[in-house]
Every structure is written in C-alpha cells, then in structure tokens.
Amino acid sequence: MDMISLKSPREIECMRRAGRLTAQARALAGSMVRPGVTTHEMGTAVRRFIESHGAKPSFLGYGGFPGSACISVNDVVIHGIPGPLKLKEGDIVSVDVGAFLDGFHGDCAATFACGQVSDEAMHLIHVTEQSFWEGIKLARSGNRVYDISHAVQQYVEANGCSVVRDFVGHGVGAKLHEPPEVPNFGPAGHGPRLQPGMTIAVEPMVCAGDWRVKVLRDGWTTVSADGSLTAHYENTILITDGEPEVLTRVED
C-alpha cells in the first residue's frame, strides 16, 4: 500500500501556489455561470487560464478524461464532460478544477446557481458547502480521517440530504490522487491518524434525494440514480499543528 506523504515546508509552499491558481480557475468558471453559456465555453476558459499561468489542467487526459474541468449540471454529481450543453435559468452547476504547477496539484470544486433557482436547490448548495466546513473542524493533528467523514455525514443527513458513497475525497500532492481516501460517511474514530504536513481534498458530494448514483455510457458522467439534484464542494487542505489551512483559496 502506498504511504501517506507528509509535505516539507518547500512542498507546502508549492502546494499553496498550485492551490491558489486552482481556486482562481474555479472562481473564473463560477463567474461564467449564466443562461446561454455552454459548458464547453467554461471548460475552455479554465484551460486557457491555467495554461496562461504556466500550469497544466490536472484533469485533462487523466485516466482518459477529455476535458480541462468537470462541469456537472443538476442531477450530474461529478465528472460532467464540457460540451455543447447550454446553461438555463434555474440550473445548478458544479465546477471541479485541478491545476498542476511546480510539481504539485491543487483540487477544488463548488456548485453555483444559474440565475434564480429553487429553494430546494439553494438549500442543497448551502448544505453541501457547510458540510465541508463542519468536516474540517475535525481536521486536526491527532484526529482520524473518519472524524471528518462522520461530521460531514451527520450535518448532511440532519439537513435532509444524503452523501454519495461511491466516490470519496483523497490525498493530494505530486499526484492528483494520493492516500488516504477521505469518505464523506462512516464512523468517527477510524481511518489513518491526521498528521501535520498531510494535504487532503475534502469533498462532500451530496444528493437532495437518495445517495445512489450511476455512471452513464460515456464512462464518466455520474448522475443521481433517482434523478434528484446534486451538489459538490471541495477544497484541498493542509493539516497543521493547529487549525487546518485551506490551500485552494483566492487570496484576499
């Protein structure tokens, strides 16, 4: 089994730069969410932005993925392939972005409202994002990975939604996906112990209905099995001696 990598101060600084660029790309894509824009246009803008800063889109070609970002609309939870789909009023749009810079990856996601959306959709977006913040309250040295997982699940389910079981968060570093896995469900007190220098992507994937999902025939697009709305929120974080540090953030 691969070891969990603990990052050196130099590596952490590289990950801050990669994370900042990734967060900026997420914000750029989010700013484009409006009726009439295609997911292809959003993906192209992400690629141009990342490449203009001397970096590479982490997802492009990863496992054969054809896009530079995952743009997932409504019942698509994750891995939506950018294409001709035009956004319309009332859609909710998840943007998942990765950037590879100076030998390290950043990985982050958020779900955006397209114009006026339903109360159910706004509730789902809020619950998904807030569950991330609830989870990382437990992302402290000495705690265990599943302490985060349990906190995410508890918050989501207390608010009438469900967490996807088939896909999970993960370590991030020189590779886009590293150990450990970081589920959004499970019993507290289990999993690897968190240590300073660990860098992990915590990414609640949440359904308004049942948690079960299915992958479409393209091999990527993953939708809620019951057709319910879905949302996704993710940041790459650093475990420290104190509070966790969010690496995928746009500097103030």
Enumerate the predicted regions with their spans.
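Active-site neighborhoods and metal-handling regions in enzymes and metal-associated proteins
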Residues: 1-252
